[in-house]
Amino acid sequence: MNKELVILKISGASLKGKNDIIDLDFLREIGRQIKVLSNNYKVAIVLGGGNIWRGNIAKEIGMQRYKADQMGMLATVMNSLALQSLLTNINVKSRIFSTIEMEKIADSYIIRNLEESLNNNEIAILSCGTGRPYFTTDTGVAVSAAELGASYIMMGKNNVDGVYDSDPNKNPNAKFYKHLTYSKAIELGLEVMDITAATICKQSNIKTIVFKMNEKNGILNAFENKSKFTLVSEDEKDLDAFKFGIKNIKNNSEKSSNNWDNKVIDIKTIKEENSLNIDDIFENSIEELQKLKEDDIQKNQKKLNEIIKSFYQDNKE
């Protein structure tokens, strides 16, 4: 089955430890979740550099903006090297790509090389943003998502679980948005991403999931609908379609009872009692499900039940 591409944006601020530039426990937690996510998706990672370099320091010492931005780009390379080392230690293959030439450290950001790496089930770690000053890492994420045809951008935030109309840590009455269009976010000036990045995502029909990064299983919980998050896209119906993701089908199947009409078949029971390759069943079933209307959740679940039931009964006989 052809895997969809997900680009995960991790802010530098979320990486920072109390006394060190990187919280190693948090980095290990990220690596573990990336490994799980890569079983079902192609994964590219973009790391910020805010744990190492902040723009306010540049202002205090009178540094020119372009030099400050270049330091920020180099900080993303340092974080990328740390993440790559951790992934290697847990047997996850990865490659670092840089939009600035540094051949002894990273591969050049060339689309065909990136696509080859992703197709070989490697994690692509993207560093240096767009490679140009005056552009944020958010814009770099959006450009990469558009160039590579990503389905989702996962925008991990520090200490906030989605998009609000004001800072929820300061305003207990802040309004939370479960779904938001890029147009509305730009109009209201909400801090989802910068205007350039939002415009690129809007034009390229890329969906963005904004979630709380610094909590256990933050990435997986957001992608499996087990935690609070905001989905940003141009169609509100995307929220229903997202709720019926592939991983969600599998999770629901493992938890439900064996009732063909109303519930999804209990996969664990079948797997224990028979020698069927359940993973193959799901792969074939999901390909058929993707041909159906994504917004008709109940119909899709019923169809999945019928496919698995038929396969199960044929093999049991």
UniProtKB/Swiss-Prot annotation:
ATP binds at K9, I10, S11, G12, G50, R54, N158, Y164, D167. It is found in: Cytoplasm. Its main location: cytoplasm. One of its GO terms (molecular function) is UMP kinase activity. UMP binds at G49, D69, T130, G131, R132, P133, Y134, F135, T136, T137. It comes from the Bacteria. Its EC number is 2.7.4.22. InterPro entries: AceGlu_kinase-like_sf (IPR036393), Asp/Glu/Uridylate_kinase (IPR001048), Uridylate_kinase_bac (IPR015963). Homohexamer. This is Uridylate kinase. The lineage of its organism: Bacteria, Bacillati, Mycoplasmatota, Mycoplasmoidales, Mycoplasmoidaceae. The gene is pyrH.
